[in-house]
Swiss-Prot record:
Quaternary state and interactors: Interacts with BPTF.
Keyword DNA-binding: yes
Top-level taxonomic group: Eukaryota
Assigned keywords, A-Z: Activator, DNA-binding, Metal-binding, Nucleus, Repeat, Transcription, Transcription regulation, Zinc, Zinc-finger
Name this polypeptide is given: Myc-associated zinc finger protein
Localization: Nucleus
Biological classification of the source: Eukaryota, Metazoa, Chordata, Craniata, Vertebrata
Zn finger intervals (C2H2-type): 177-199, 266-288, 294-316, 324-331
Gene: MAZ
Chain residue ranges for the region called Disordered: 46-65, 108-131
Tissue: Ubiquitously expressed.
Gene Ontology terms: cellular component: nucleus
PANTHER family cross-referenced by the UniProt entry: ZINC FINGER PROTEIN, ZINC FINGER PROTEIN 771
Organism encoding this protein: Mesocricetus auratus (Golden hamster)
Ranges of Pro residues composition bias in the record: 117-127
GO biological process, one term: negative regulation of transcription by RNA polymerase II
Length: 331
């Protein structure tokens, strides 16, 4: 405040020295602003130092000047120089393409040697069969014919090539199965047996249609008959579920008329007849006994098998259809 020239009374005394204007309400803010402006006006200031100075108006910028033609002369000169260099390069490339070829060097090939006829090829080596294996008659004849052809025409390359291929085909082994009559080889035994049937005139693995089929029987000497105990029912009765008997030497194999092989491992210890399962064996054992465990509930007739008894019971109530009648008695 001493800078502004205030005395010891301070700001309060300064404000009292300037009476507020009359004619309007006493607004503290408005009165303070008026007093402040009157004070700075008396001190010779245009405005209050606490107020920000107004920003100066923007200075208008002058428009950019266009380049003169003198400034563009270096650019035009550089463009002309690049066009001249491109034309010179194109002319040099055209001169290289249209240049005549260089004269060829003198040939050092002996043309007289080329006019001479070619020398005959050397004769092929003699083909000999290995001593360890005996060649079949057909293969031996083929080898002899090939050797004769090689001796007669040693310079014929066209005739030697087919003979070599024939020898390669004939000497190639197909398998270890060889026919004893014609020495033909096969890959497996099945094909060999079919081939041997051609020599004998019989079909392999087939039974003649007129041949009589006999039931498969097993000698009793091959059977192992167990000792029957009293706990098993005794008497060899099959109705109580008798056991099975294994056939010695791996069982019996039967071949049907269609060529199907059936293995029968269960044999009857009384007659030696063989069966393929236990069911048919037990049903067969009923024929050796006199026991008839199944009885008809209507007429008390007894049967060995249950299916026979069931069929008989149906005949009592007329459930069994009998379409066949006797021509003599009508039954």
């Amino acid at each position: 405040f001493p800078v502004l020239g205030l005395d010891s009374r301070g700001v309060g005394g300064l404000m009292n020295s300037f009476p507020p204007p009359q004619g309007h309400a006493q607004n503290p803010l408005q009165v303070g602003a008026e007093l402040q402006s009157r004070f700075f006006a008396s001190q010779g200031c245009a405005q209050s130092p606490f107020q920000a100075a107004p920003a100066p108006p923007p200075t208008p910028q002058a428009p950019a000047a266009e380049p003169l033609q003198v400034d563009l002369l270096p650019v035009l000169a550089a463009a002309q120089e690049s066009a001249a260099a491109a034309a010179a390069a194109a002319a040099a490339a055209a001169a290289v393409v249209t240049a005549p070829p260089a004269p060829a060097a003198a040939s050092t090939v002996d043309t007289a040697a080329l006019k001479q006829p070619p020398a005959p090829p050397p004769p092929p080596p003699a083909v000999s069969a290995p001593a360890a294996e005996a060649a079949p008659p057909a293969a031996a004849a083929t080898i002899a014919a090939a050797a004769a052809t090689a001796v007669v025409a040693p310079t014929s390359t066209v005739a030697v090539a087919p003979v070599a291929s024939v020898l390669e085909k004939k000497t190639k082994s197909k398998g270890p199965y060889i026919c004893a009559l014609c020495a033909k080889e096969f890959k497996n035994g099945y094909n060999l047996r079919r081939h041997e049937a051609i020599h004998t005139g019989a079909k392999a693995g087939r039974v003649p249609s007129g041949a009589m089929k006999m039931p498969t029987m097993v000698p009793l000497s091959l059977l192992s008959v167990p000792q029957l105990s009293g706990a098993s029912g005794g008497g060899g009765e099959a109705g109580a579920g008798g056991g099975t008997t294994a056939v010695a030497a791996g069982g019996v194999v039967t071949t049907t008329a269609s060529g199907k092989r059936i293995r029968k491992n269960h044999a009857c210890e009384m007659c030696g007849k063989a069966f393929r399962d236990v069911y048919h064996l037990n049903r067969h054992k009923l024929s050796h006994s006199d026991e008839k465990p199944y009885q008809c509930p209507v007429c008390q007739q007894r049967f060995k098998r249950k299916d026979r008894m069931s069929y008989h019971v149906r005949s009592h109530d007329g459930a069994v259809h009998k379409p066949y009648n006797c021509s003599h008695c009508g039954k």
